[in-house]
C-alpha cells in the first residue's frame, strides 16, 4: 500500500450504499492514513490501478485484493481531541500540524523551498507544488511560527504522556541559513525546560546542514532532541543527479561531516538520515545503511512512491518483493550494528518518534517485530480526556 497505493472508488460507493453518506461527500472522501493490525499505521495514497482496495462489510473496514479476498481489517484514524483547538494567536491547529497515528505530530513550518525557484529541487520532491495538488489537506502554505508550534505541542502534552514531533521545512532563500530553526528551539526550551538529555522535548528536525560545521553544535546547544540530515540517495552519482541543490550548495563531504559531528553531540540513536528505497540500486542503498549504522546514525529507509507534482510523477516504484527484501536486509543491519534499536528502553526513553505511528515507512515496524518488541507505542496512549484537570494545570 505504501508503494502502490489503494483503490478508493469502491469504498466511496460503500459509504453511500451502506453507510448513508451523501454522494458528494463520499466522492470527495480521501482519508490520510489507516490503522492496520498490530498497531501499524500507514499513509493512504490513492491509485486507481492499485492491487488493493478498501471495502466495508457489515459496518467494518477491510483491505481487499483484486479477487475480493479480505487481506486484513483496518480502521480510519480519528483526529486527537485537541485537533479543533486554536493557538494563542487564534490560528486553528489544522493550519499548523498534521497528525501521524496517535503519537506523532508532523510540522512543516515552511512549504517554500528555494531550490524550486533555482530549478535545483530534489527530483522526487513535491513540497512546494503540493499546495496546488492537495488543497483539501489540513496543511497551510503560510509560515508557521515558533509560538504556534509550541502551542500545539503544549496541547498534545495534556492528552498524551509522551508526544513526539517531526519538524521539517523547505530550504530558505538563504540556502546556508537556519531558516527559523533557532527561533523554534528557543521557544521550545523556554516553554518546556529540561535538566538532562532525556528531558528534552522529543523533536526530530529534518533539515539541511549549513556551510558552517559549527552550526551542528549550535542547534544541539539550543536544546534539540534529535536531528536528521537526509541523504535521500547514497550513491554519489545519483546524489548529484537527484539532489542537485544539496550537492551544489552544501556538498557531499560537508553533509557526511555534519552527520558524523552530530553523533558526537547527540549520541547514537538521536542522529538520523533518510534514504529512499527504489531511487537507486539496492546495493548502494544498503551501502548507505551500513555507512550510517557504522557511525551510530539511524537510517530511515523510505519506500519510493512517486509524488504528484514531482519529476517522478507517473513512474512505477519497485515491486513489493524488492521493497520487502530490501527492508528486511536493512533491518538486519540496523539490529546488528545498532543493537539499542532492538530494546524497549530505546523506544520508550530515547527515540524521537513512535515506531508504530511513523507513517513515512515501515522499517521500524520490521525492526521492532524482528527484535520481538510488542510494547506498542511504548505503552503510551492518547487519552480522550486531559491527563490532569484544569485546576491542577493552573496550580502547576
Predicted regions and their residues:
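N-terminal [4Fe-4S]-dependent radical SAM core
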Residues: 38-123, 127-141, 346-348, 362-370, ...
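Generic hydrophobic, aliphatic-rich segments that mediate packing or membrane embedding
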Residues: 118, 145-149, 184
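Active-site mouth loops of central-metabolism enzymes
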Residues: 110-112, 133-147, 203-210, 278-280
Amino acid at each position: 500500500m505504501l508503494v502502490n497505493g489503494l483503490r478508493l472508488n469502491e469504498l466511496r460507493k460503500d459509504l453511500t450504499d451502506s453507510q448513508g453518506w451523501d454522494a458528494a461527500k463520499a466522492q470527495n472522501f480521501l482519508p490520510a492514513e489507516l490503522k492496520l493490525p498490530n498497531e501499524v499505521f500507514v499513509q493512504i495514497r490513492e491509485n486507481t490501478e492499485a492491487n488493493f482496495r478498501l471495502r466495508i462489510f457489515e459496518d467494518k473496514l477491510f483491505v481487499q485484493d483484486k479477487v475480493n479476498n479480505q487481506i486484513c481489517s483496518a480502521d480510519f484514524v480519528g483526529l486527537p481531541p485537541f485537533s479543533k483547538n486554536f493557538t494563542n494567536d487564534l490560528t486553528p491547529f489544522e493550519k499548523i500540524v498534521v497528525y501521524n497515528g496517535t503519537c506523532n505530530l508532523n510540522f512543516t513550518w515552511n512549504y517554500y523551498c528555494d531550490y524550486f525557484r533555482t530549478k535545483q529541487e530534489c527530483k522526487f520532491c513535491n513540497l512546494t507544488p503540493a499546495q496546488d495538488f492537495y488543497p483539501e489537506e489540513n496543511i497551510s502554505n503560510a509560515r508557521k511560527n515558533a509560538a504556534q508550534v509550541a502551542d500545539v505541542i503544549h496541547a498534545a502534552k495534556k492528552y498524551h504522556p509522551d508526544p513526539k514531533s517531526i519538524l521539517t521545512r523547505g530550504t530558505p532563500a538563504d540556502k546556508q541559513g537556519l531558516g527559523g530553526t533557532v527561533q523554534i528551539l528557543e521557544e521550545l526550551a523556554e516553554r518546556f525546560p529540561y535538566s538532562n538529555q532525556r528531558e528534552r522535548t522529543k523533536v526530530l528536525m529534518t533539515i539541511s546542514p549549513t556551510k558552517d560545521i559549527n552550526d551542528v553544535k549550535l542547534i544541539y546547544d539550543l536544546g534539540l532532541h534529535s536531528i536528521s540530515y537526509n541523504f535521500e540517495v547514497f550513491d554519489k552519482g545519483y546524489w548529484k543527479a537527484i539532489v542537485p541543490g544539496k550537492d551544489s550548495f552544501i556538498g557531499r563531504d560537508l553533509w557526511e561531516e555534519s552527520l558524523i559531528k552530530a553523533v558526537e553531540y547527540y549520541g547514537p540513536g538521536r542522529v538520523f538520515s533518510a534514504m529512499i528505497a527504489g531511487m537507486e540500486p539496492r546495493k548502494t542503498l544498503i551501502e548507505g545503511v551500513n555507512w550510517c549504522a557504522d557511525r551510530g546514525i539511524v537510517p530511515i529507509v523510505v519506500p519510493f512512491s512517486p509524488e504528484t507534482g514531482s519529476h517522478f510523477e507517473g513512474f512505477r516504484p519497485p515491486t513489493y518483493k524488492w521493497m520487502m527484501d530490501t527492508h528486511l536486509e536493512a533491518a538486519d543491519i540496523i539490529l546488528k550494528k545498532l543493537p539499542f534499536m532492538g530494546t524497549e528502553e530505546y523506544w520508550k526513553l530515547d527515540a524521537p518518534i513512535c515506531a508504530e505511528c511513523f507513517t513515512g515507512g515501515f522499517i521500524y515496524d520490521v525492526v521492532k517485530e524482528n527484535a520481538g518488541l510488542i510494547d506498542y507505542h511504548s505503552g503510551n496512549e492518547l487519552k480522550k480526556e486531559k491527563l490532569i484537570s484544569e485546576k491542577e494545570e493552573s496550580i502547576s
